[in-house]
Amino acid sequence: MTHQTHAYHMVNPSPWPLTGALSALLMTSGLAMWFHFNSPSLLLIGLVTNTLTMYQWWRDIVREGTFQGHHTPIVQKGLRYGMILFIISEVFFFAGFFWAFYHSSLAPTPELGGCWPPTGINPLNPLEVPLLNTSVLLASGVSITWAHHSLMEGNRKNMQQALAITILLGIYFTLLQASEYYETSFTISDGVYGSTFFMATGFHGLHVIIGSTFLTVCLLRQFNFHFTSNHHFGFEAAAWYWHFVDVVWLFLYVSIYWWGS
């Protein structure tokens, strides 16, 4: 590559956007095949392809930013704008679920018994597992902030401890959510209540798993001395994403678990 006299990163040709698009096609097609023909093979191929693509693409980004020095302050600014736009798109994604929930619950139709929750649905007690889940996620928000402050102060040990605590709390939340799903008396096919409940909380649970994975990668990178107090966008993006997951859960708890019950 020729010597560059500017602060922008001129990326090399990469196969990962193409393989990522193909894996997305395989996953969506495979999901339809699984639903309609009970054949998960195409979906599994798509998931494996997507996982390999993400690993190798992000490996390249880590290499470019950490070892090759391509992530200059201007490049980091662009990455921050990209992450902010991504989180905004996620906000609208969840807004659709909340819209569906309130559209159905504020004016229940005669088919639902004219009431909410619909006739025959026994909602979960918001003061039991959902409240514990809320406490767990709020605690994880505190620990991720502790990790960020420790990183800014150059305290590696505290940063690693706080990040490990956050990951463990994320795993604990996922296990609690799984046990809650196992104990519910209704399913995703039990009318609009089941559909909106499991779609909204399920997609949030998926985001918790993604966020926990993101933070685990950050912890491994921290063990390998990838982050400094002025060069740590990977961790910063993970922290933003985790705070977003926290805030979405608060809205889910107040809307679906507390008000909706």
From Swiss-Prot:
Give GO BP annotations, semicolon-separated: mitochondrial electron transport, cytochrome c to oxygen; respiratory chain complex IV assembly
Task: Give its localization.
Answer: Mitochondrion inner membrane
Q: Which GO terms describe its molecular function?
A: cytochrome-c oxidase activity
Q: Where are the transmembrane segments?
A: 16-34, 41-66, 73-105, 129-152, 156-183, 191-223, 233-256
Q: What class of enzyme is it?
A: translocase
Q: Does the keyword Mitochondrion apply?
A: yes
Among CDD domains, the record links this protein to: Cyt_c_Oxidase_III
Q: What does this protein do?
A: Component of the cytochrome c oxidase, the last enzyme in the mitochondrial electron transport chain which drives oxidative phosphorylation. The respiratory chain contains 3 multisubunit complexes succinate dehydrogenase (complex II, CII), ubiquinol-cytochrome c oxidoreductase (cytochrome b-c1 complex, complex III, CIII) and cytochrome c oxidase (complex IV, CIV), that cooperate to transfer electrons derived from NADH and succinate to molecular oxygen, creating an electrochemical gradient over the inner membrane that drives transmembrane transport and the ATP synthase.
Q: What is this protein called?
A: Cytochrome c oxidase subunit 3
The organism of origin for this protein: Oryctolagus cuniculus
